[in-house]
Amino acid sequence: MSAPALEAIGLTHTFAAGTPSEQVALQAVDLVMEPRSWVVVLGANGSGKSTLLNAIAGSLIPDRGTVRVSGRDVTHWHEWRRSAVMGRVFQNPATGSIGHLTVAENLAVAAKRGRHRAVLRNPLSRAGRRDLADRVGELGLGLEDRLDTPVGALSGGQRQALTLLMATLVRPELLLLDEHTAALDPRSTEQVVQLTEGIIRKGGFTTLMVTHSMQQAVTLGDRVILMHRGRIVESIGGARKRQLRVEELLASFDRLRSADQVDESAAEMLRRLYI
């Protein structure tokens, strides 16, 4: 029997511990993902969802807990080393690519993901350019004709689509999507969401996706988990996930409020964010 694609066990982290600004971000969070599964993480600002993603990606080392990928303990691996087995798309389209390099050069860098201080030493061969053009052409954005265009000249949607391709160019054991449509306009968001679903389903990538969008949580993925105050408070999968509606998610947050886990102002913020 193969190991789970991801095991995050007992993740606990506190920012500014022992100071007046102390903030408990994660409280003994457990998350296990099977290969090819797609989990969507939903929660308000401060719920711990981004801290969870950062702990898995290696952007921060949790105070306690273990992270295993395909059975390997990566808890204390540096972020660049984890990038050999993880692909990540950030909220800001400019974060996952290098603006002054061309489309082709960015893809060439992505092909070296996980190698310490990977650099471009040789120009791309003609065959290499053709291969990159074919891969970029699959996005359907016309970027195959703009391989020599600096990435900084692309629109936010084009750049985020390219970053998604870069994150999956070398097959990752785990794909991390960190609110990757939050900075896009509605049209670009729809386009990138469609590309995301196509790439993940076609490639069978194990995916952990953080979002603020209830609509995305309903329509994407195999399981949605709700986070609040550093805990996973609900996990919805299987037939219930397939039949899930936005109204049911709203009801879940209302139940949290009535249980005195979310105050009235936070509940109102959730409605403004998610509807």
Identify the function of each model-found stretch.
Residues A167-T168:
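ABC ATPase C-loop
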